[in-house]
């Protein structure tokens, strides 16, 4: 039984170390965007607006599929 507990503790330690290393070294999405050059950042923002508009249209289409009676 002692070996099982020891193995579990070591396993949790190894996985925990890997997880903490990932969390500490991976930048946040905002940090990545802020580190972009101005021209790429402007392009990213423009594409982000286009994506949000497209998602809005897709959401409207899905709503129309679910509730066809609401169509005018």
Curated annotation (Swiss-Prot):
Q: Where are the bilayer-spanning segments?
A: 8-24
The protein's matches in InterPro entries, at most eight in alphabetical order, are given as: Cbp4 (IPR012420)
Q: Name one GO biological process term.
A: mitochondrial respiratory chain complex III assembly
The entry's localization annotation reads:
Mitochondrion inner membrane
Q: How does it sit in the membrane?
A: Single-pass membrane protein
Which UniProt keywords are present, listed alphabetically?
Chaperone, Coiled coil, Membrane, Mitochondrion, Mitochondrion inner membrane, Transmembrane, Transmembrane helix
User: Is Protease there in the keyword field?
Assistant: no
Name one cellular component (GO) term: mitochondrial inner membrane
Give the family this protein belongs to, as stated in its UniProt record: Belongs to the CBP4 family.
Q: What does this protein do?
A: Essential for the assembly of ubiquinol-cytochrome c reductase. It has a direct effect on the correct occurrence of the Rieske protein, core 4, core 5 and apocytochrome b.
State the protein's name.
Assembly factor cbp4
Q: Which organism is it from?
A: Schizosaccharomyces pombe (strain 972 / ATCC 24843) (Fission yeast)
């Amino acid at each position: 039984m002692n070996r099982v507990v020891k193995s579990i503790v070591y396993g949790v330690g190894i996985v925990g170390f890997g997880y903490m290393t990932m969390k500490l070294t991976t930048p946040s999405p905002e940090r990545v965007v802020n580190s972009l050059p101005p021209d790429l950042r402007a392009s990213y923002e423009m594409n982000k607006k286009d994506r949000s508009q497209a998602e809005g249209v897709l959401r409207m289409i899905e709503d129309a599929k679910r509730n066809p009676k609401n169509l005018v």
